[in-house]
């Protein structure tokens, strides 16, 4: 088959419609623009909030992609927003400390952790600086495709392109239209609550001195974790800015309430007898609407395909493979999707767009699916620890896993290396065997990344 060079003139530029202005959509826009494709992005909301939600971590396998944006310009832009997550200090509910552990793959110089809203806003501003057309308040109400093009319907108008990328997130309406599939839910028996506190909330409250006070400000920022029966609590600090975000996973006995105070009351009920209960309550009580999320944790059955029947439309990111927060890879896998898609379109060229999307799916589908499995495995591993005496005997059991096949992976190098092999397998009707997953195709707790 013919592999195209990166150079393209106006008539050969691939026109791409991207739906959704989250991490997946913005990464796809930036990556595709960087490969010379013509991109337009549609988002139903009328504005972006500069700060929203809790924190999100991008692992080294995604950061190696965004590190190239503007020859490092983007990473310099977000550096002031980053939390230092080099280490984790872990204790149990009695106050017993298991020690401090290195956080591989998310540490300084490898990955980064920021407020979710701030990351999306920074990506949006960077994309706009590149001249990428972004249309806010433009809800996509329909999708369509022919053998030669694909498009969307916005405000009653049909807009055409060579392909459509649906990156609408976990609640995507386009997923069913494009793939003909519903993402089935299976509850895990657990729920999670998360919150973000900035200096406007924390700076005047002495009750938070135990985590952000002057004495603590001298200490190194890190991730603090507490393990207890049926509850796991974590706090990540940015002491120089008086900021933190927290995360609590708990059994369904603490099912999220309809209001913030009700949810927190239920969590505190599950933390009866905890040595740090009163301290953690001071953090949770500062939760505000717009910066607090509480949800039942459910796994989503993998989609059989991410493609439309004529293969000119594809779903990526959470719309395709939403993972539990415990995977630590939701945003990172979206970036891998985006980078792989851009390269496949570059190599296939305008005449083989359908093949490019098919190769993207082949290179990414199984990998994303196993990462989804990992989210559940990590959640169950953390939540099912009930023998705390055994943990004291071997504290390394509480170390966060860091599999090399996930965190040390270079999705761009892999896409360039494997494109022809995957394309020929598709054209010949043969199975493509990916090499970016464990040999047995299963997730396991590994501690071997750089």
Curated annotation (Swiss-Prot):
Reaction catalyzed: cyclo(N(8)-(alpha,alpha-dimethylallyl)-L-Trp-6a-(alpha,alpha-dimethylallyl)-L-Trp) + AH2 + O2 = okaramine C + A + H2O
Span of the signal peptide: none
Keywords: FAD, Flavoprotein, Membrane, Monooxygenase, NAD, NADP, Oxidoreductase, Transmembrane, Transmembrane helix
Entry binding sites for FAD: 43, 116, 318, 331
Cellular compartment(s): Membrane
EC number, UniProt record: 1.14.99.-
This protein's record includes keyword Acetylation: no
Spans traversing the lipid bilayer: 14-34
Membrane topology annotation: Single-pass membrane protein
One MF annotation (Gene Ontology) recorded for this entry: monooxygenase activity
Active site positions, chain numbering: 194
Primary location recorded for the protein, binned into one broad class: membrane
Disulfide bonds: none
Pathway, per record: Alkaloid biosynthesis
Disruption phenotype: Abolishes the production of okaramine B and leads to the accumulation of the cyclic prenylated tryptophan dimer cyclo(N8-(alpha,alpha-dimethylallyl)-L-Trp-6a-(alpha,alpha-dimethylallyl)-L-Trp).
One of the record's GO cellular component terms: membrane
Record family assignment: Belongs to the paxM FAD-dependent monooxygenase family.
Described function: FAD-dependent monooxygenase; part of the gene cluster that mediates the biosynthesis of okaramine B, a prenylated indole alkaloid that possesses an unusual octacyclic ring system, including a four-membered azetidine ring and an eight-membered azocine ring, and that exhibits insecticidal activity against silkworm larvae. Within the pathway, okaC performs indole 2,3-epoxidation, facilitating the formation of the hexahydropyrrolo[2,3-b]indole (HPI) moiety of okaramine C.
Record's protein name: FAD-dependent monooxygenase okaB
Organism: Penicillium ochrochloron
Lineage, top ranks: Eukaryota, Fungi, Dikarya, Ascomycota, Pezizomycotina
